Design a protein with these regions (language model features):
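Conserved active-site loop/cleft motifs that coordinate metal ions or position small ligands
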Residues: 297-300, 316-318, 325-333
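Outer-membrane beta-barrel and related beta-rich outer-membrane complex signature
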Residues: 62, 133-135, 257-261, 342
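Detector for outer-membrane/organellar transmembrane beta-barrel domains
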Residues: 189-306, 311
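Extracytoplasmic loops and strand-loop junctions of Gram-negative outer membrane beta-barrel proteins
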Residues: 61-64, 139-144, 217-220, 266-271, ...
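A generic beta-sheet turn/junction motif
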Residues: 114, 162-166, 238-242, 319-323, ...
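Outer-membrane beta-barrel "beta-signal"
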Residues: 186-197, 319-321, 326, 343-355
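N-terminal periplasmic/intermembrane-space "pro-region" immediately following the signal or transit peptide
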Residues: 2-53, 165, 200, 355
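Outer membrane beta-barrel
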Residues: 34-197, 204-210, 283-307, 311-313
């Protein structure tokens, strides 16, 4: 009897590891399947990102509500959703919520038309200057350049883009100032990487490497709803070790009856109404130097080429906590103008954080 009991116990004990082994094997397979599923979701599903930018401004020359400017501002609170939809199609949707209300920025689909040729349709930023295409979180200063601001608007339309070796191009058509009317805004841009790997979508020398990188571009735009609505643009950017330099210029046609409907970019950044950009050739140049791995000094000079002789000088120092993802910016700007507002200086301290 005891032999039978012992034999039964032995058989049971021997069979348990086999059952457990089968169970663990099944569990491993389920975990591996779940892991693969999550990886697939992470690769093709929506990705959330964005940035926050805020600043403290001080000026004894500019006023708000009858008092000198000396307070805080929220420059950007951006939320971006991007992802792959499959079959070479991808998408991007972004909102600005700094005003307390969500404002649609980008909303477009992008797909591959042919090898090296892409299509884009929806609401997107016009491709004209590099300074307007660079995200606000990757700037050297608290504000964009004046020309970068002018050409950073978004509109609904269709764009074809591509690249061939060191050449990149964009050709697009958007609704323009008459909305869904029968006149369109046409834009074309060609950019070439002339040395090294070219410069990326970041202002300044941070992260550019030790080699010399040089890029240049020309752009053309025609606003069909204006009698003479053509704009020509040219730009160049270079980085070499700790140094960077960039320049840009635009030539505006006469518009309709001498008006383009766009005011002086330097003054417009401060809510000041200046002269129209029609029949002007504004330009600007920027230089920077990284004097340590964490600090970069920059200076920018801009000339609006307007009847009010408006010019601007900006000087800034960036402190990179985690590159452009977390950085502090100390900035001083002086504007010389014959506008009724007269000359003014502004001090600023900004913080930018990307996620």
């Amino acid at each position: 009897m005891n032999k039978l009991v012992y034999s039964a116990l032995a058989i049971t004990l021997c069979s348990v590891p086999g059952i457990a082994s089968d169970n663990w094997s099944s569990l491993d397979q389920e975990l591996n399947s779940l892991s693969a599923s999550l990886q697939a979701q992470n690769q093709g599903g929506p990705k959330l990102g964005g940035w926050l930018r805020s600043a403290f401004r001080s000026s004894s020359d500019l006023q708000t509500g009858g008092s000198d400017i000396q307070g805080f501002e929220l420059n950007d609170a951006r939320i971006e959703i991007t992802g792959d939809a499959g079959n070479t199609y991808s998408y991007k949707i972004s909102f600005g919520v700094e005003t307390g209300t969500a404002v649609l920025k980008d909303a477009y689909a992008k797909w591959e038309i042919a090898n090296g040729v892409n299509g884009k349709m929806g609401r997107y930023k016009v491709a004209f200057f590099q300074s307007s295409l660079i995200p606000e979180s990757r700037l050297l200063f608290i504000h964009r350049s004046a020309l970068g601001d002018i050409f950073s608007s978004r509109d609904e339309g269709f764009e074809i883009s591509g690249e061939f070796e060191q050449i990149q191009y964009q050709v697009g058509v958007q609704n323009g100032t008459d909305g869904q009317g029968d006149e369109y805004r046409f834009t074309a841009r060609v950019r070439a990487d002339l040395m090294g790997n070219g410069t990326g979508k970041t202002e300044g020398a941070y992260g550019s490497g030790d080699e010399t990188n040089l890029s240049a571009a020309v752009a053309w735009q025609d606003e069909g709803s204006l009698d003479d609505g053509m704009v020509l643009g040219a730009e160049v950017q270079m980085t070499s070790g700790p140094f960077s330099v960039a320049g840009e210029a635009a030539d505006f046609d006469e518009g309709t009856a001498g008006a383009f409907g766009i005011t002086n970019g330097i003054l417009d950044q401060w809510g000041i109404v200046g002269g129209d950009v029609a029949d002007t050739t504004p330009w600007g140049v920027t230089g920077s130097y990284m004097f340590t791995d964490m600090y970069e000094a920059a200076v920018r000079y801009e000339d609006a080429d307007d009847t009010e002789d408006t010019t601007s000088i900006r000087v800034a120092v960036n402190r990179y906590v985690a590159g452009h993802d977390i950085k502090w910016t100390v900035e001083w700007q002086t504007v010389d103008t014959d506008n009724a507002i007269d000359d003014f200086d502004v001090l600023g301290l900004g913080l930018a954080l990307s996620f």
